């Protein structure tokens, strides 16, 4: 399966956040979504990626957008990591079981490694994917570019 392309609807995805709340991504319509996939918690680049989301919560709200951090880590790990790095507003979603199902549904799962790509997927308020970018594992996604993309929607 290839990577989801702009113009396609976001598939049905249900995940739990770091506080064990069920999140149905398709129910978040009328809000733009920035799905920020990161390979694993407890790694430096992933930490900087999530800190960039947290630092831009107000900017995202002004754009009627919400950022969600997603990785294959289990919920307790997401909770401990969020607490350790000071993430208190941004929801960190667990794609742990079925392992990598959300990433797989978007064509972003690295089967050989058991993790997702580092990627950003932007979804408009109608549930349509409008932007997809896969980043090198060593690179923090450019939050400025992502905010500009959201602003243009």
Segments predicted by a language model, with ranges:
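Chalcogenol-based redox active-site neighborhoods
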Residues: 1-153
């Amino acid at each position: 399966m290839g990577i989801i392309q702009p113009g396609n609807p976001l598939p049905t995805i249900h995940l739990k956040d770091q506080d064990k709340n069920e999140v149905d991504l398709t129910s978040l319509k009328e809000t733009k979504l920035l799905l920020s996939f990161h390979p694993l918690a407890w790694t430096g680049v992933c930490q900087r990626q999530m800190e960039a989301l947290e630092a831009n919560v107000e900017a995202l709200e002004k754009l009627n957008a919400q950022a969600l951090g997603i990785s294959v880590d289990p919920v307790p790990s997401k909770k401990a990591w969020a607490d350790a790095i000071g993430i208190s507003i941004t929801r960190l979603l667990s794609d742990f079981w079925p392992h990598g199902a959300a990433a797989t549904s978007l064509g972003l799962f690295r089967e050989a490694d058991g993790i997702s790509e580092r990627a950003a997927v932007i979804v408009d308020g109608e549930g349509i994917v409008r932007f997809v970018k896969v980043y090198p594992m060593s690179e923090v996604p450019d939050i400025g570019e992502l905010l500009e993309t959201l602003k243009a929607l």
